[in-house]
Each structure stands twice: as structure tokens, then as C-alpha cells.
Amino acid sequence: MATKSCPQCDQQVPVACKSCPCGYIFISRKLLHAKQSQRLPPTSENRSDPKRRRTERIKRERIHTAVNRDLENRKRSRSNSQSEASRRGRGRPKTATTKKHEEEKEKQEKEVDMYANLSDEKAFVFSVALAEINRKIINQRLIL
């Protein structure tokens, strides 16, 4: 076990303890540095940054050339086209309801398009074939 010695009573105390049984309080390095920075007069660094903030990603300045402008325009046009058309996203889908609605709409459109150009003779032939298939299915169910 790691221990430290108390400066008042020279007793060995575990490192994790913040105080000694004799009453001495160990000051952590963080608190020590915070107190020292409060005592010191504000320097140029301390004035501009009174609170310590998390660092952010540094934004680089871009050199604006014709090539960069073309690339930016392409990116913008792609993002606009992608937002209009439904594109498949990464990861697990949140809900599948939109996909089902799209599939139903497509099916309805396809059905309307398929039978719009059908002649009367072809429709009759298909209806006879469909009636034959239905009759066979019904006969199979009766046997089972």
C-alpha cells in the first residue's frame, strides 16, 4: 500500500486520505495550484483566460483560389441533391415507418403504370389465367 507521512506527527497515512488522524489536512496539487494562481497578480495569460476552458478545434484559414471555390460549390450541390433524394444513412435506422410508406407509394404507382397500357384482349387472357391459378390454390386447400 502506498503511504505518505504527515508533516506534523510523522505518522504514515494512505495516499488516498485527504487528512491525517491528528487533524492535518493534506492539500492536493490541484487546490495548491488554484490557490497560488489566485494570490498572483493577473498576468497577460490570466487576464485573457480567467476560466480554464476546454480546447476547441482550431479553424484554419483557407486560401481562396478558383480550385477551392469549385470544390465548395460541388460540395454544396451534392448536399442539396442528397437532401432532396432519400439516401441511406449509416447505422441502425431509428424507425422503418418512412421506408414502408415509400414502398407502398411505389407499389401503388407501379400498379397504375402496369395496367394503364393493357389492351382488352390481354386483360381477358390474364384474367382467365388468374382464375385458373386461384382455382388450383382453392382445390389444394380443400385437400389439406
From Swiss-Prot:
The keyword Cell membrane belongs to this UniProt entry's keyword annotation: no
Keywords: Coiled coil
UniProt biased composition (Basic and acidic residues): 63-74, 99-112
Keyword Coiled coil in annotation: yes
InterPro entries xrefs: C16orf87-like, UPF0547
Start-end of Basic residues biased regions: 50-62
Protein name: UPF0547 protein C16orf87 homolog
Natural source organism: Xenopus laevis (African clawed frog)
